[in-house]
Swiss-Prot record:
One Pfam family named in its UniProt record: Anticodon_1
Start-end of Polar residues biased regions: 584-594
Name of the gene: leuS
Disulfide bond in keyword set: no
Chief localization: cytoplasm
Gene3D superfamilies according to UniProt: HUPs, Isoleucyl-tRNA Synthetase, Domain 1
Organism whose genome encodes this protein: Cyanothece sp. (strain PCC 7425 / ATCC 29141)
Protein name, entry field: Leucine--tRNA ligase
Amino acid sequence: MESRYQPTAIEEKWQQTWAEVGIDQTPTDRSKPKFYALSMFPYPSGNLHMGHVRNYTITDVIARVRRMQGYRVLHPMGWDAFGLPAENAAIKRGIHPAKWTADNITQMRSELKRLGLSYDWNCELATCSPDYYRWTQWIFLQFYQAGLAYQKEAAVNWDPIDQTVLANEQVDSEGRSWRSGAKVERKLLRQWFLKITDYAEELLQDLDQLTGWPEKVRKLQANWIGKSTGAYLEFPIVGRDEKISVYTTRPDTVYGVSYVVLAPEHPLTLQVTTKKQLKAVKSFIQEVTAASEIERTAEDQPKRGIATGGKAINPFTGAEIPIWIADYVLYEYGTGAVMGVPAHDSRDFKFAQTYQLPIRQVIIPPDPDLNEQPILQEAYTEPGLLINSGEFDGMPSTDAKAAIVAKAEATGWGQARVQYRLRDWLISRQRYWGAPIPVIHCPQCGIVPVPEADLPVVLPDDVQFSGRGPSPLAQLESWVKVNCPTCNTPARRETDTMDTFIDSSWYYLRYPDAQNDQQVFDPAKTNDWLPVDQYVGGIEHAILHLLYSRFFTKVLRDRGLLNFDEPFQRLLTQGMVQGLTYTNPNRSDSSRYIPSNLVDPNDPKDPETGEPLEVSYQTMSKSKYNGVAPEEVINKYGADTARMFILFKAPPEKDLEWDDADVEGQFRFLNRVWRLVTQYPVIEPTTKQGDALAKEEKELRRAIHTAIKEITADLGEEYQLNTAVSELMKLSNALTDASCKDSVIYTEGIETLLLLLAPFAPHISEELWQQLGHTTSVHQQSWPQVDPSALIVDEITIVIQILGKTRGTIQVPASSSREELEEYARQTPVAQRYLEGKTIKKVIVVPGKLVNFVVADA
């Protein structure tokens, strides 16, 4: 046998062999239960990082274990390949996005294969391939036919550098683009939306089904959907026929309304403004609407407003109240107008103080001293009793909500309403590298969907990338001009492409039938494999990707393609991989991070200034100079060591701190396993199966089956992979220390160790399995089954105490009675020595643990 563990040679050998025999291909035999294991697919940026390695290794262990446990497993991989970085690369480097993306996919696929990940590459897909986005466009048409895709003019976040629309999530707290850093502007454009709000209630209610998801993720989605119960209330405008409609969750405070506020974009803003205020109001609106939504609503930003001079009437009090315009009110939310109740809303309180507006208290604490009502120093937002509220005085505020809404409905002043924070999904992007929206704009027919027979609408290759002006598609007249498929008159293609979240909202449905060129997928195949049994990915996708995927699943179900409600049964959100980070707090933000190769870890100082550095663990990134390239680790230690460290260092859901010493530790462990097997005696065992086992054989077999029991439990539904690796180490130690290496039990132990190790370190396990003389792959073996009888303990260790102090131990039969335990203890040399000449006052026996002699001096 090979005497040295040489991971590079072993790993290359087995990766090639596995590929040649197709060991990881998805089985078609439906007699076995199915298991769909899926990692969130990556954006092909060019190189794997340790976050990728962690995600994919976790999922790979799960897939490998389930195969050995008798499941037919689908474990695919693909590429979320559309997006801005490819187009930006085209602008900066003069390379076409398609080539940049294809080159990156080739590089990353090679790196994934080096990790020994058991993907069925026959299922591979890339969202930028016409073979894929043909069906993305087909799905868009399904939404359009169902009335779930529509176009309207909307205020959007506009990145003036990247020249594209940004989702709110792509704008930081300072109102800057997440990618270019440009100050985001507000701009009106005709945009395409998907009507996710039609599914808001179902998306909320079905969260209760997702018991296999982290509670944190479910709460994040529930908060994002943001269901609230309240009322629409109407405030007539003085001197006009119109009314201002507001939505409120606090109708119990309506008697405290001292002003109403309109969004700058509200259609009534100029109509309610007096001539005296008109110029100032127009200037204010122009200034405010240029700011991003994030800037306007940020908690730490002062709220700005302007009086219109107009008045409205509070129908409940009959009082005239001023109409204001403020930056924090957004037209896209609710009605685009809010009622100002400064006494009972913190934001309104600050606004009223700033602009010296009346503060009218209408709720007091439940047990107040009614004769003493001090001037409010802050808004009172808790439940209480109503005051200054007419017929509702003295009523608990929780009861007053329903009573006041009932009055509003009876008088025509308003009505009860359920509302959601969730808004329809804006999917238009003014970029090239995305799936074209399959729509034609005809001057005669209006919006005309591209016929299904004409799909895909393929991205043209002959485009120019300047990074300025309209999107490259809009500038290519030869592509834009087309005849209307309905009336044949000259028309124009839609030049917007789809948000890349569209591509990732259905990719998991395509994997079971990835090569199908006749339909989006065969419903029989997809309904057989779905829902995904275990989905693994980062917590950063808790809201958008996961919510959109749930939305797509429900729509395609309603279109008759799917027979399930939710796409992902279980979700594991793995923690971040963190690296040792050196920071000089006295430097500017752009240069505060110091590369680790320039720092002495024993005396961390700034190499230029000599200032002491702050040392911490932070998420690995290029900008922090704290990353570790997977390729470097694999080249030095092998993929199996990289996998073992990633799995051992921390529980999957927790952040992982990179530690070179622990990587070395895992390499040493695999070397011990290598020596353990390669030095395994080839002599015929002296004991046979069925022979009475000696004590040391029983102990070893107990260790073997304890490992099976514990590791199987760790790999159940909670995936405590770090403790599973610890159990592997315990078993290897037991085998190393065993004195019965010529026993059939030792043979069982060696083989069991390799079977249990195989999902974690697949290459070394396969090599050693073959060296033991097996001709079929270790990965095609059945998962070891625990023998309960092997766990039965024949002997136990009992502690002997004198006056509560431990003086020794004794091995006794596990079935010993109290009387027998006392007698065994009395007969030991240690007890006889300490009891000589003493009077035994009492004997305390704790079965399974100890015998304590309480003595007095003679």
